[in-house]
Amino acid sequence: MNLRTVALAGAVGLVLADSSIVVLALPEIFRQFDTSISGVSWVLIIFNLVLALLAVPAAHLARRFGPGRSAAVGLAFFAGGSLVCGLATGLGPLLTGRAVQAAGGAVAVVGALELMVSTFGDNRRAVATWVGAGAIGAAVGPGLGGLLTELVSWQSIFLVQVPVAIVAGVPLR
């Protein structure tokens, strides 16, 4: 497996881990921002909603601008959104950051799939790698989020993603 494939799998895993990484941090966010349960639930909802809604438009972007460039730009937006989340001082900025993360994540994940298909030349192997990376990310997300929240802070679950997204995006340019 070459560096580009590892970066692609890492990008998919990172984005899909983020779909669930906040679950165990929600009580801390709820307390810190003194918000309602429905308000704090949007921290989880907005990410998954935007990610799902932008998947098809992201595929059009990947075809128009190329999957490598799209995936790298998507990861840059994901990193920027993660930074906004990690520095958020209220629920509004946190939700904005989550929406930006998801928009970037949608573009990155779709671009990664197209790059994997072209890299492997075998759709089944590419899709299996893509799905496997996503499943691992989604499975690791809650535990990692809970650990970081307990040991450091809820903000750390977002701030740690910034350098990871940047490093994953470099080989994709």
Give the location of each predicted region.
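Transmembrane-helix bundle of Major Facilitator Superfamily
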Residues: M1-L172
